[in-house]
């Protein structure tokens, strides 16, 4: 790893640099309590591996190239990760590399095969394995550059890792002016269901709850609008108007995802697993009786 000062650059400026350098990159950042930036923002680019799944077909491309037909796609991911485990090094940021991407709702079908899951155009999952990470330390106003390397050929791979660190530092220090972000006209949205249809869905859901069939459900609508430019301009607005514990900007070959979420569904850190879903959560009691 390598440290450089970050007092003259922001995570968004870094993201813009990555956008000019790579077709596959990400930014992960967080605001705690809706008012204070978390210590780290994480960025990465040029993943060494991409793993996608659709209808039980897992495709790996990059460091490994193969296709696997399976009804347990997560087992393929576990197998891949077993070959890319990094040691825990005291003092480094909590994320030093790994898979970044998304799991679609259709993944539920592998755990509950009896459910009739409607699959859309999205893959069941789309994950990229990043061995290079830029960790922006808001507290110390430093950037930690991290490169992971394989140990099968230490001298050769160490040389490549050092070269990658130099390239990352040069990318961050590049002062070439970037073109301004374009802002298009106000978008026109269309919805996949009408207001009347959605009202009926909500009423039917309430009936299920009153009858005791279910205790909660999340109903949603999909709004769509054509948009020709990068979502980065919209993400800049999103992160300032709706700062949240989990904010993401992800770009894969021109397809972009941005999101802002308050919910910790599952978190694993230092061997401790935490879940705190917003929907249905209630305070724990101090005793079993209070629970």
Regions found by a protein language model. Give the residues of each.
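Extended alpha-helical targeting/anchoring segments
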Residues: 1-291
């Amino acid at each position: 790893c390598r440290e450089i000062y970050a007092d003259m650059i922001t995570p968004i400026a870094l993201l813009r640099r990555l956008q000019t350098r790579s077709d596959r990159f990400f930014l992960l950042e967080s605001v705690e309590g809706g008012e204070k930036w978390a210590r780290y923002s994480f960025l990465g680019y040029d993943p060494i591996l991409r793993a996608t799944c659709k209808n039980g077909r897992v495709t790996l491309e990059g460091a490994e190239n193969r296709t696997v037909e399976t009804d347990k796609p997560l087992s393929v991911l576990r197998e891949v990760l077993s070959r890319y485990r990094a040691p825990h090094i005291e003092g480094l940021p909590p994320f030093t590399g790994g898979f970044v991407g998304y799991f679609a709702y259709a993944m539920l079908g592998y755990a509950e095969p009896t459910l009739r899951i409607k699959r859309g155009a999205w893959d069941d999952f789309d994950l990229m394995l990043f061995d290079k990470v830029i960790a922006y330390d808001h507290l110390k106003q430093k950037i930690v550059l991290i490169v992971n390397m394989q140990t099968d050929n230490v001298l050769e791979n160490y040389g490549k890792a050092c070269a990658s660190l130099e390239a990352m530092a040069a990318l961050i220090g590049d002062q070439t002016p970037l073109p301004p972000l374009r802002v298009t006209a106000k978008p026109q949205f269309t919805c996949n269901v009408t207001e009347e249809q959605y009202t009926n869905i909500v009423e039917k859901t309430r009936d299920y709850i009153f009858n005791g069939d279910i205790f909660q459900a999340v109903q949603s609508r999909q709004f769509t609008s054509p948009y020709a430019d990068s979502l980065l301009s919209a993400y800049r607005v999103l992160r300032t108007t709706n700062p949240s514990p989990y904010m993401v900007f992800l770009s894969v070959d021109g397809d972009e995802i941005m999101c802002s979420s308050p919910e910790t569904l599952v978190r694993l850190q230092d061997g401790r697993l935490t879940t705190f879903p917003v929907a249905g959560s209630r305070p724990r009691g101090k005793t079993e009786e209070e629970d």
